[in-house]
């Protein structure tokens, strides 16, 4: 058996946390031979701490062979101590009458604090995934608040958009999800994201040529993927928690264990390529190997794609401007 690794999860008693923790503890994220110690953070409110205790009782009751230990806390410095992986799931949801700018600021404070705590106590190789929305900007804030950690350690979750797009394309083209390669999602995890299947293939056949429907792409596919979260809230009365947890598992598993040359989408700090300013956390196609991600380079960007990529970049720039004074 390998040495246990430490996995920190924030918002651990929330809806996504509840869908996530049992799968991490069963080995779905890091492999069936990798023991884990779960370090679980919840807000310092009695109700949340009680709920966390209940979740930990259930985790105990599963008797997972790979669960080597657990702590529950309201202190980020305890939760992130020596963490090898950190899934930042907890964030403040948008309340009634709350402007997006207010939401950015409230979450800004949370992610400044968490970035500072990671900077102080986490493993220097910690892999950070921000799930809590607005994910890209929250990841940017955490990254900027952790100057002693490599910027590349901070990522945002675009995998839910990626997985949503996969299924829409599979259904449209009449192919199996598992057969689709080279799909990507550019930009922000928001309705402005740009899901791009120009390079996608299934069994060697180009899917753009197979689907061959620009109207469907613009008027059906992109809006369906972009507004899927809202559609689920409307149908279920609750946000998409299980599918978000599933995407987080996919993202971290691929980063840790590799993608065998397959493209996946991750929100990562830009290196200036594809016309995205350096440092902006932006969804791009990557492959993963030996615990590192590598962006897919040199893809051609056509006029429609440039327009969509710039639109989602503009939103990210606006978000960044809204919290700029907090990072001084």
From Swiss-Prot:
The active site is at residue 189. Pfam families: Ldh_1_C (PF02866), Ldh_1_N (PF00056). Signal peptide: none annotated. NAD(+) binds at residues 11-17, 107, 114, 131-133. Keywords: NAD, Oxidoreductase, Tricarboxylic acid cycle. One of its GO terms (molecular function) is L-malate dehydrogenase (NAD+) activity. It catalyses: (S)-malate + NAD(+) = oxaloacetate + NADH + H(+). Gene3D superfamilies: Lactate dehydrogenase/glycoside hydrolase, family 4, C-terminal (3.90.110.10), NAD(P)-binding Rossmann-like Domain (3.40.50.720). InterPro entries: L-lactate/malate_DH, Lactate/malate_DH_C, Lactate/malate_DH_N, Lactate_DH/Glyco_Ohase_4_C, Malate_DH_type2, NAD(P)-bd_dom_sf. GO terms for biological process: malate metabolic process; tricarboxylic acid cycle. Its EC number is 1.1.1.37. Substrate binds at residues 94, 100, 133, 164. HAMAP family: Malate_dehydrog_2. Belongs to the LDH/MDH superfamily. MDH type 2 family. Catalyzes the reversible oxidation of malate to oxaloacetate. This is Malate dehydrogenase. It comes from Acinetobacter baylyi (strain ATCC 33305 / BD413 / ADP1).
